[in-house]
């Protein structure tokens, strides 16, 4: 019998429909799994933790209603965010990363009066019509979805990640038509620490030619030791979008804009619509505010542990693969992790996709093996740990990964 829900992911096995989660474990009707996804990285503390329960009880006890009207909790949350992200002066709330990117793009086009947007190959910006395209190795653009209007394809330009020479050539050819450049500074498809020079190039190029630089930091915001990737790399963007771990499970997205953008909107007297019934709603705002206060107070303890277990996993798997000549390596940026199925050094998704396509059967069998051992390995391949990930379970994950790699890749 087919499933009633038509969203992505619901066409598969109903035995993998989850009903609850506790700390680092998630449950279906019949089985339990150690989680490697944590709601695509959003659940930084884990599932159904004591602090989450405490915050929700406080919300109920104080008789707070879920206002869609302006409320004090959204303002209080915004002030904490600005202290956490010092490069920005204003925050625009919404409910998801996709929505944040839609509105960030709207801001750029409203100010510049230009329509073309640059995306970096390998960056994912959610279910945004303008970004639902992919490229071939030669950067030929094709649609990822039906229902996209022809002008969208005309308005998207792709540049290769971590390739300054090729990116400069494409940008030089189109720079007068470009409103903005979107990029995930650390891509989920390849959490590469070695992108600073490329990101610095983009920052300087965009500044020189008046192209707005937009960082999509859905996966890096908060997880970068309660900072952002741009703060880590010392890059200043015009606009950045955030979500996921800023809500620890609550649906949240927001756009952070610089003083430059704020002043341009005011100077040009632009009316840019940002509304939405639940944008900045009091439930999400109150929860996120209390959660961020908790993170700030316990920053050292939480992030030291996250980095410790993430580094431990990386070293154990990589040392095992090197010692046994297994063509696989772990790539990591703080607690964002991906197992890449090649031992060759790669710098972008195009190289990764080509090399992994040669091992499609082995990868599929390996992932099914991990699932059979009661470890939930997310379909998108991005591994996130949480503060609730126990060392006992991390050791079990490492042991299982090693046995699976030996079984299918030697």
Where do the model's predicted regions map?
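Conserved N-terminal phosphate-binding loop of PLP-dependent enzymes in the Aspartate aminotransferase
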Residues: 1-410
